[in-house]
Amino acid sequence: MATLFIADLHLSQQEPAITAGFLRFLAEEAPKAEALYILGDFFDYWIGDDDPQPLHRQVAGALRQLSDNGVPCYFICGNRDFLLGKSYAKRCGMTLLPDEQIITLYGQPILLLHGDTLCSDDRDYQRYRRRVHNPLLQWLFRRLPLRLRLKIAVGMRQQSQRSNSAKAMTIMDVNQETVCATLRRHGVQRMIHGHTHRPALHHFSLDDGRCALRAVLGAWHTHGSMIRVDAQGIHLIELPAHPAEDEIITTRLRSANLV
């Protein structure tokens, strides 16, 4: 058996094909795993565990079924869903992990993280990140009316899109020195992360000559992306394209016993 990792699905009501692709992944790939790790930006935005969107209930039910069937699920928050809390995690049957988590698979320690903290050249974003991760600010935000929270989230998303469109792509990728420093700080040689939407397996050497590996998950825009870790190593896998709209409609009708 293997351990599976995914990130950057950006699930939303506006992208039903991505949701359908994820549900297919839960039905076909995830049940065969020893565990599933979701490394952030699972949802396109998250304004609180009390948001009653039908999508949130649907996803929670599917993850709970996976967990109830014996596949543990773990979650690290991303820059889009860092407000996802214990209440929703409990509904999903998944365990919340800190921003940086070391796990050991087949005798090898691996550092897991979303990946945004590695993009240290993007100083504007890092300043923004420090602000929105302020516990007091988060406490206040969660107590605002749901409609106001949504309005703020939409405005911040639009501002982020405008800001990113003016930035060089290199600024929004990881800084290699930060990568090496993070590995040294944790005393490991392997990491798995998402965030950059640039799926790849990067092999490089640390300052002391030891070999290191940085495995990067892809986004789920048109098809799924996962990393599989088994006894043979770390594998980056591209999943099939998401179901077409007519397939999604047929699946919904079947689930409602209308076809």
Curated annotation (Swiss-Prot):
Domain of life the protein comes from: Bacteria
UniProt binding sites for Mn(2+) 1: 8, 10, 41, 197
Main location: membrane
Lipid bilayer topology: Peripheral membrane protein
UniProt keyword annotations, A-Z: Cell inner membrane, Cell membrane, Hydrolase, Lipid A biosynthesis, Lipid biosynthesis, Lipid metabolism, Manganese, Membrane, Metal-binding
Subcellular locations according to the entry: Cell inner membrane
Enzyme class, first EC level, given as a word: hydrolase
CDD domains: MPP_YbbF-LpxH (cd07398)
Homology family: Belongs to the LpxH family.
Record's protein name: UDP-2,3-diacylglucosamine hydrolase
Gene that produces this protein: lpxH
